[in-house]
Amino acid sequence: MYKLVLIRHGESTWNLENRFTGWVDVDLTETGADQARQAGKLLKDAGLGFDVAYTSVLKRAIRTLWHVQDEMDLMWIPVRNEWRLNERHYGALAGLNKAETAAKFGDEQVLVWRRSYDTPPPALEPTDPRASYDDPRYANVPRNEIPLTECLKDTVARVMPLWNESIAPDIQSGKRVVIAAHGNSIRALVKYLDQISDDDIVGLNIPNGTPLVYELDADLRPLRHYYLGDQDAIAASLAAVASQGKAR
């Protein structure tokens, strides 16, 4: 049996402000840093360890991983920073307040933009300063692969090559893997692992800073999965994530 741990980054500054973030590189709040440290403690107390870590190229996920590694005394393990694990690109919604956007366009439209499988938000213009073409962290990414908006289907399409070519082989070679990433890149992985339908994925939310442990068979099919931590607090966190895109 293999184990895989997925962790969404701790609360970010734009999570706190209820803004669409996507590829904008905002940092953790102090609450988010505390969540990440607590995640590391939970993993250590559960007797889990890691041989390799994966994260995105965005600091809120990177710093979350740092706190987890520090709490577990695993700062030395190799880390792969992969743009394919970035948050879904929210296009022209990046930086907008979710509740204000819902008040303008309606809760239903914002839910479609946030959670539907194949409907992207309005795209950025290529000349928009929020576009990532000139960002040095994507210097080796072909220009046509750098998005101006994404739906979850697009996020799955960029995450799965990394799973197939790197993450899955690492797991099957016996390495213990942790992935610190983002709500939608983790939703993409969970959709694949649990074979969630395109319709049902709309209802899946991922809480900040909470370790999600998968136990996998030899073919990397899930035997079970569970969150570490206080289950009532996790339920409250999931409810809070679900309500972010509603008009106040």
UniProtKB/Swiss-Prot annotation:
- What InterPro entries does the database record attribute to this sequence? His_Pase_superF_clade-1, His_PPase_superfam, PG/BPGM_mutase_AS, Phosphogly_mut1
GO biological process annotations for this chain's record?
gluconeogenesis; glycolytic process
By its UniProt entry, which Gene3D superfamilies does this protein fall under? Phosphoglycerate mutase-like
Q: What PROSITE patterns does the record tag this protein with? A: PG_MUTASE (PS00175)
Q: Where is this region: Disordered?
A: 118-137
Where substrate binds, per the record, is at 8-15, 21-22, 60, 87-90, 98, 114-115, 183-184
User: Which spans does this entry mark as compositional bias, Basic and acidic residues?
Assistant: 127-137
Q: How does it assemble?
A: Homodimer.
UniProt xrefs under PANTHER family:
PHOSPHOGLYCERATE MUTASE
Instruction: Please give the function described in this protein's UniProt entry.
Output: Catalyzes the interconversion of 2-phosphoglycerate and 3-phosphoglycerate.
Q: Which family does it belong to?
A: Belongs to the phosphoglycerate mutase family. BPG-dependent PGAM subfamily.
Q: What is this protein called?
A: 2,3-bisphosphoglycerate-dependent phosphoglycerate mutase
Organism, by scientific name, is Cupriavidus necator (strain ATCC 17699 / DSM 428 / KCTC 22496 / NCIMB 10442 / H16 / Stanier 337)
* Taxonomy of the source species: Bacteria, Pseudomonadati, Pseudomonadota, Betaproteobacteria, Burkholderiales
